[in-house]
């Protein structure tokens, strides 16, 4: 199942190009991107806050050092994923390692999928006129790799 999701992403030049192009914009400020993504998650899917109680008051945003740390760690994981697009076995490995942390917190593939819409909104905000549905679809496909690992 993970292998199929990896093959879909790594086997598509269009998906890889959209991920790389958009990551070029998102990674210009890793911390701000991560915090925006988390804020969008909590705004669009307030039910997901229950997975993050260990972080304290997530409404404090950047002032919450635990949330800030999570946001930075998350975006470095995304960076790892994008860096691994030309090596399917490497992408599979880094995604499976990432998945372990979520499995330990009892986050299912379906629950993890809640990040797709917040990611779309983050992409729109950060990319402006460069945003497209194809870019959002590429990120949804990458999220699908994580979901398959969960």
Curated annotation (Swiss-Prot):
Keywords, ordered alphabetically: Heme, Iron, Metal-binding, Oxygen transport, Transport
Domain Globin intervals: 10-150
Binding sites annotated in the UniProt record for heme b: 102
InterPro entries for this protein: Globin (IPR000971), Globin-like_OT (IPR050532), Globin-like_sf (IPR009050), Globin/Proto (IPR012292), Mb-like_M (IPR044399)
GO terms, molecular function: heme binding; metal ion binding; oxygen binding; oxygen carrier activity
Residues modified as Blocked amino end (Val): 2
UniProt keyword Metal-binding present: yes
Family according to the record: Belongs to the globin family.
PANTHER family reported for this sequence: BLR2807 PROTEIN, GEO09476P1
Quaternary structure (record): Heterotetramer of two alpha chains and two beta chains.
Name the UniProt record assigns to this protein: Globin-2 A chain
Organism annotation: Anadara inaequivalvis (Inequivalve ark)
Lineage: Eukaryota, Metazoa, Spiralia, Lophotrochozoa, Mollusca
